[in-house]
Amino acid sequence: MKKDFKIGCIGSGFIMKDCQIPAYKSAGFHVSCIASRSKDKAKEVALNHNIPVVYDSIDEMLEHGDFDILDIAVPPEAQPEIIMKALEQSKKLRGILAQKPLAMDLLTAKNLVNACKQKSVTLAVNQNMRFDQSVRVAKSLLNSGKLGDIVLATIEMRAIPHWMPWAQGLKSLSTFIMSIHHLDTFRYWLGNPNLVFASTTKDPRTKFSHTDGVNLYILEYDSGARASSWDDVWAGPAKEGAGEDIYIRWRIEGTLGMAKGTIGWPKYPEKIPSTLEFTTVGDNGKWHSPVWNEVWFPDAFVGTMAQLLRAVELGIEPEISGDDNLLTIALCEAVMISASTHQAVNPSSLIESN
């Protein structure tokens, strides 16, 4: 894979400075320049990671920056404008790696996808949970057929995210920021569901106004498979003085085998690898437990950028393409609509109506 594409980074917050740029350095990718809403923060990141050029503003970098790939890590409401400006102003632009959510509504996301197509710029969306090591190995097991026909897949999250200040005022809190990871993972594992049932309640710890805190949802598939997640961002009064029981567990049950695992990120900044175990009907009760040293944050971010670089080099669609991500955004919309109407929602109908 060609690694010397020049990557221009926009943003200097946690995801960019602690996850994406360190991952790129470890993989040998070339970051050529950076800009942020705060030049001082951009300069600090550049100094820490030996990035040669810092621009005074995002607009200056978009117009004059020497980069082939644009890597964006900004709050979701700021992202669409940056993408549109990049398409208009950047001279050499060949690919964009956008943050999830691509946009906070399906129509805006569709417009961004179409605008990139019109400019022949490859768009990928940073759905990085797909590149968590246990999630990736689980997909390999599914592809191999070792688990048989899938009956049930579940994710149980009891973890406390650190909501950023920019989350206040968004139309969605948990669904478009946290649950989007699990919804996209179910799509990655099992494909697109036909119906969604959801219920949500507010997170008592979050003081600003919001509608979706603790999310519960069930996905129905025509194959008969079911998927469900409990996205519990409250996780008990662990921050208020009680003991804590923090974890994310997942499980996939098939007719020929099952797999289960844990996700390590709730222990961040301690680097705890995710885990996976699997067993099949031919194993006489034995469980297989592969191990690795890599962790979701930051190592999974190598995978998302590599997807884009490979797609640009070969002239193909990345697995995490803008078109694919529209289906994840539709699933997020379906969760919110179902929770508010107390009715099942078909995500495909939302794609067709927008």
Where do the language-model regions lie?
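Rossmann-fold dehydrogenase core element
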Residues: 109-129, 147-155
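C-terminal helix-rich "cap/oligomerization" subdomain common to oxidoreductases
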Residues: 1-3, 9, 69-72, 271, ...
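Beta-loop-alpha module in the N-terminal Rossmann-like domain of NAD(P)-dependent dehydrogenases
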Residues: 49, 53-115
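Contiguous beta-strand/loop segments that form the cofactor/metal-binding neighborhood of enzyme cores
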Residues: 1, 177, 183-268, 302-314, ...
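N-terminal Rossmann-like dinucleotide-binding module
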Residues: 1-49
